[in-house]
Amino acid sequence: MGRGLDYSILLEGSLKLKEISYIHSEAYASGELKHGTIALITEDTPVVAVVTQSKLQLKEFSNIKEVQSRGAGVILFMKETFELDKEAAWESVFQLPAMEDSFMVMPASAALQLLAYYVSLDKGLDVDKPRNLAKVVTVE
């Protein structure tokens, strides 16, 4: 879950998780949380949250508290300069190197790709040969 640029980052991260670990994953815009998405949250729901945009961090942390209150385990990727609620129950927290908001796409995207990579390795999958994927562009 994320807002603005973070949502775009999550779309890519979700795709990578599907492609190489074969786990169903959906990216959700945090602002849409109360329009149906919240109904899917249970104690067994892992939630990946990305918070890198300075102007949106307070709203995003508020949305994260909502999913935590429903028992979801949250894996948080956040800009290292943001203040973390240490009393909240986090599954994992990954602090990303701080830079201009518009450039946070780079470390956040790489972090989500690494998440997909290590989940795949943990499942014993060959990340270099994902099944049923074909190159879109071929060179003759």
Q: What function would you assign to each model-found segment?
A:
Residues M1-E140:
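A SIS-like phosphosugar-recognition module
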